[in-house]
């Protein structure tokens, strides 16, 4: 063994030790934060939405903005700005306060109250299968499970979600396998292992009927590809079960494909193409766009025999999507043959949830992010292979245990100041079964690196996505773009992206939902995500595939109701 090999091994061992110490400190701080003062940052980014100049938008959408009354529950408070293509969602959810006492003198009482409350709720959850739901008495109703006020009388308030009763029929056993849950809905997850052009093996999951009994099952469904965020898998689109976007759109008649980037839960590669350890982790978002996303799109289109698909992505997945659409000439320059204009020619509708195009103020405020930014290029600190590999070792040992999911949640809350206020509490532990995943240190350098010779997301997003330059030179070739921007998301700057579309992309067919009370992850896991995100998506996709004229959508859409199996299940519950 040469000197360089010994040095590299020593460096990797030291980096592992440093990361373990770092994670231990974060865990202690996260637990203290959770039990003493669990916090949710309700601020937005410092960027203001600028829509005052009426002359900036010189054309209207192909699909005029529509009201969502036909699909949404009555309490949604929506403000429509048709000229600028924005729906402002001002809806406020009535939430149960976890502590009724305030002040430092009641600290111990608060801790005891939290402990006792969680113990009682856990006992009630275990008994709920055998106990019926009784109106007029305290019960383990869906309102309690959804972290809302327990109901003593059935009074219609904001938190009365008609789909909440679906939670009562969910299996709360923790199993890190989507098939375990979806088989209970008569859906099978078909799994594909695909090899990218540069030799990495990635996962693609397909929702299909468990039992094919009718001719309608064989009808061609329009394909939807879903792509996950950083350190997640596409299980994040489905972990809500019957209240997930994946399930809802599947039951609404669409062909759902869950795409996963390299390296996932099980890193795998073609050793002939990727022979060395260094090459196995020598990739970042550019390779994920050029190889992973293109392979996922090509595979879905080949298997469904459609020319175009709908891409729905979250967080990092939106970065991949916009990188491909805006910079496709850099990935596949003119003369690239079949790859030329790859993304604009194969994506019909692009739906971005919590779009990560510009960095938010949280990246400059959080101490741990500042530390990572400073040391991310230092191989003695984070190594040069898998980022925080200790997380994956712990996951492989502990996934499926409620303690593991709880720890993941507390760290998540501590680092980003988001919490489960708007989630279905009973499903919280399930969400963390499908994360984290392996990512490379080089990918994290792409996100955070301060190196002036590199273009990173934190310091160079203006170069990748220039604010005042049109991204689509030929708007007729651009897909329909739908943005769901959470106002309480400080990890990214969604308001800056809104300003770009309103003030620069006037010829592109876009539509924006700006949701006051949502944070970065609520766009996937909020208790009312179907009403506020799923049904607007469904409405616009139905409009696209039915090819109805835009004038048909100037009313409140009362004549375009779609009854989905999800709603029928909710009525039975």
Swiss-Prot record:
Q: Which UniProt keywords apply?
A: Hydrolase, Lipid degradation, Lipid droplet, Lipid metabolism, Membrane
The EC number on file is 3.1.1.13
Question: Has keyword Hydrolase?
Answer: yes
Record-level GO cellular component terms: lipid droplet; membrane
Which Pfam families does the protein's record reference? Abhydro_lipase
What does the entry's PTM section describe? Not N-glycosylated.
Q: Which reaction does it catalyse?
A: a sterol ester + H2O = a sterol + a fatty acid + H(+)
Q: Which family does it belong to?
A: Belongs to the AB hydrolase superfamily.
- Indicate what this protein is called per its UniProt record: Sterol esterase 1
Q: Which organism is it from?
A: Saccharomyces cerevisiae (strain ATCC 204508 / S288c)
